[in-house]
Amino acid sequence: MFACQHEAVVPDFLVLAKGLTGGYLPMAATLTTEAVYDGFLGDFSELRAFFYGHSYTANPLGCAAALASLEVFREEKVLERVASMVPVLTQELAQLRLLPCVREVRQVGMMVGIEVGAADGTGFDWRERIGGKVCLAAREYGLLTRPIQDVVVFMPPLCVSGDEIRFGLEAIGRAVEAVCG
């Protein structure tokens, strides 16, 4: 479920937000190891308590929405569904890798970064904002996405179908060809 699990990393802190409530209410949580938690455990007089909080934590309505969202996540077997869509995404990305201006395609699960560069293998001048131009062109083909410099981000919702994956990647491919030649 978390990126750190794909890398076999056990963090001391894990910060969660946005998706906890399925996007319905603001909610955030900070998870820690038992050792970190114990470091803050104590009476007020010991000055060990972690005095911190904000409107995105411990809100009863947000907590209820988060629990309901997690229940739907389990009931609808979202992780199992995602596991069946990852191979579809991986297979469809093969076509993008063939484009001369696609330098690299990086994928972890359903998260993809498509780096664009000149056909000769060099990068573009960052001031040209080619990634942004590709994303603007993708709108013409029906896809809203965003760049991180010259990397086009493709992160479909976890309820995506194979046809929708193909549609999105086709739009990116057409946009890359339109902008980069």
Language-model segments: residues:
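Conserved N-terminal phosphate-binding loop of PLP-dependent enzymes in the Aspartate aminotransferase
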Residues: M1-G181
